């Protein structure tokens, strides 16, 4: 598998889990949008720009999973995002669901490996 293809798969998976990643990040510490973008890049090695991250943030806020508040005391006004109780519940559900998917994939893989390595002895005539 080529490095480009691996990177493409990692990017797709990360983008698919972006809600969970954002909730996880701001669950540990309230952050503004640029901090979230930077943390994702440093943690996953993938850059999602403002045009990707801010709509995710708006959607999470609309669903009640995060709150935002303007910090006007900083050098530059920043919208600070924090996780809500509903966001913590959703994060836990998403983490549990992802764990179940991974366990299921491993059990399917192990079952396939077990059946493919079984050797049937030839019948003597």
Regions found by a protein language model. Name each.
Residues 10-54:
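N-terminal helix-turn-helix DNA-binding core of bacterial DNA-binding proteins
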Residues 77-95:
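Basic, amphipathic "hinge/linker" alpha-helix immediately C-terminal to the N-terminal HTH DNA-binding motif
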Residues 1-11:
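Short, Lys/Arg-enriched N-terminal segment that forms or immediately precedes the first helix
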């Amino acid at each position: 598998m080529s490095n480009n293809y691996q990177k493409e798969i990692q990017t797709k998976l990360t983008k698919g889990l972006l809600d969970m990643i954002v909730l996880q990040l701001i669950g540990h510490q309230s952050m503004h949008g640029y901090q979230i973008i930077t943390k994702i890049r440093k943690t996953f090695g993938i850059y999602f720009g403002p045009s990707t991250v801010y709509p995710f943030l708006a959607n999470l806020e609309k669903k009640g999973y995060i709150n935002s508040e303007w910090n006007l005391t900083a050098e530059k006004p920043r919208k600070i995002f924090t996780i809500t109780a509903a966001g913590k519940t959703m994060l836990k559900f998403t983490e549990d669901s992802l764990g179940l998917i991974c366990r299921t994939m491993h059990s399917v893989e192990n079952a396939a490996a077990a059946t493919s390595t079984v050797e049937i002895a030839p019948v003597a005539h």
